[in-house]
Amino acid sequence: MTLLKDLLADPGLPRLEARMLAEHVLGRSRAWLLAHDTDPVEPAHEAAWRQLAARRLAGEPMAYLLGGREFMGHWYALTPDVLIPRPDTELLVETALHWLQGRAAPRVLDLGTGSGAIAVSVALGCPQAEVTATDLSAAALAVAEGNAQRLGARVRCLAGDWYEALPAQDRYDLIVSNPPYIAREDAHLAQGDLRFEPRGALTDENDGLAALARIAGGAPGRLLPGGAIWMEHGWDQAEAARALLRQAGLREVHSRRDLAGIERISGGYL
């Protein structure tokens, strides 16, 4: 049988990825792998590892192969039905949590929740909040509901297209969203991890601003007086996003930069 150290030395994969796949297949920690690197690997485990390795070599994201990824300090289960949460999106959550500080029972809406990473992170960071998450995809909502339950977050999940998922009378203190903002002709859709992620979570099949326009335009009708909205967008879309928010009648519209200095989110107040 193949020894563990020989499996991890497979030249096809970076060693870190090889180890992560082994941890996943064997259900063991890194420390265990180091202590048992001369152990033989059961044929079934080796076959499972090699199958995952082949998928990785074909470009499939590690997050899908491992069944999840960490975001804001918590592990989120993921399937190919949902977008993989990026560190960039943590700015949206951090901004939301900062704005919610000191509010007794704020009502928060996450539009297009996907895996639920944003909604669940807000609910965990602000336990007194009433968080609602929407998504057009039933499969995505199932992932979000599973993550909320596993992490003990209080999140109401509703199926539907943006604001159409909501009861007519619902109003919110805060709206957040990381919508599809890649233009349909963008070459990046055929590159890297994006090839494997749900297209509907990446592109609006338009110019990249259609979903942002719907969210901004519908915000005044769904925000409580003094409420806020924050939207994530592309690196070159901040000016356009601000224009959409101003056109909707929101005030004090501005953008915030991520750690790389990119204007990553834009928002305003009712």
Swiss-Prot record:
Protein task: Methylates the class 1 translation termination release factors RF1/PrfA and RF2/PrfB on the glutamine residue of the universally conserved GGQ motif.
The keyword RNA-binding is annotated on this UniProt entry: no
Gene3D superfamilies in UniProt: DNA helicase RuvA subunit, C-terminal domain, Vaccinia Virus protein VP39
Binding residues for substrate: N178, P179, P180, Y181
Upper lineage: Bacteria, Pseudomonadati, Pseudomonadota, Betaproteobacteria, Burkholderiales
Residues that bind S-adenosyl-L-methionine: G112, T113, G114, S115, G116, D135, W162, N178
Protein name, UniProt field: Release factor glutamine methyltransferase
GO term, biological process aspect, one: methylation
Family: Belongs to the protein N5-glutamine methyltransferase family. PrmC subfamily.
Keyword Methyltransferase: yes
EC number: 2.1.1.297
Name of the gene encoding the protein in the UniProt record: prmC
Pfam families registered for this protein in UniProt: MTS (PF05175), PrmC_N (PF17827)
NCBIfam families recorded: hemK_fam, RF_mod_PrmC
